[in-house]
């Protein structure tokens, strides 16, 4: 959610194009995954613009096929001389066709970090979040959705992790059609 100088929170994003390149660039001043030489990854960038705010958003999707990993980041570029305020940016929206997953997270405290908590998805919203301005052992910005029959060696698991996080919110919502939405 972006707020313009007049207080408006309305954005009209239009598709402008895409870029496809080998490798993955490092994020400036943030820890990140990367592939400087273009041998392990391929990146798709989708470019969206708002002509009224003079805002460009670059949605970067990188696959590391050897590791079965998709990495995503978003760039917000203010092309105007006006102040824009970024109020909220969700990292992902993923819709799954059913909700037959277990929600697995790791919470804890100093000297007993990463205690495993596993619960079945249920109707409504399940979430983990933190307003501490940093990752911590209390609420780790990682979770996974696993089929109940999954073992260490086989089965279906989706893992979600912020590589760099301040405040964060991870939510899974199960609707009345028994589908799951991850945000």
Task: Annotate each predicted stretch with a short phrase.
Residues 1-182:
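Polysaccharide-binding surfaces and accessory modules of carbohydrate-active proteins
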């Amino acid at each position: 959610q972006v707020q313009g100088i007049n207080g408006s929170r309305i954005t009209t994003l239009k598709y402008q194009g895409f870029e496809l390149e080998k490798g993955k660039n490092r994020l400036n001043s943030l820890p990140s995954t990367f592939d400087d030489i273009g041998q392990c990854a391929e990146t798709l960038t989708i470019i969206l613009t708002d002509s009224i705010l003079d805002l460009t958003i670059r949605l970067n999707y990188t696959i590391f096929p050897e590791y079965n990993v998709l990495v995503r980041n978003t760039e917000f570029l203010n092309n105007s001389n006006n102040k824009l305020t970024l109020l909220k940016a969700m990292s992902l929206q993923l819709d799954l066709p059913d909700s037959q997953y277990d929600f697995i997270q790791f919470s804890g405290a100093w000297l007993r970090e990463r205690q495993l908590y596993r619960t079945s998805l249920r109707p409504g919203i399940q979430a983990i979040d933190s307003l501490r301005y940093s990752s911590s052992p209390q609420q780790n910005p990682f979770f996974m959705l696993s089929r109940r029959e999954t073992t260490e060696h086989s089965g279906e698991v989706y893992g979600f992790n912020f590589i760099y996080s301040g405040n964060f919110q991870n939510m899974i919502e199960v609707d009345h059609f028994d589908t799951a939405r991850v945000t």
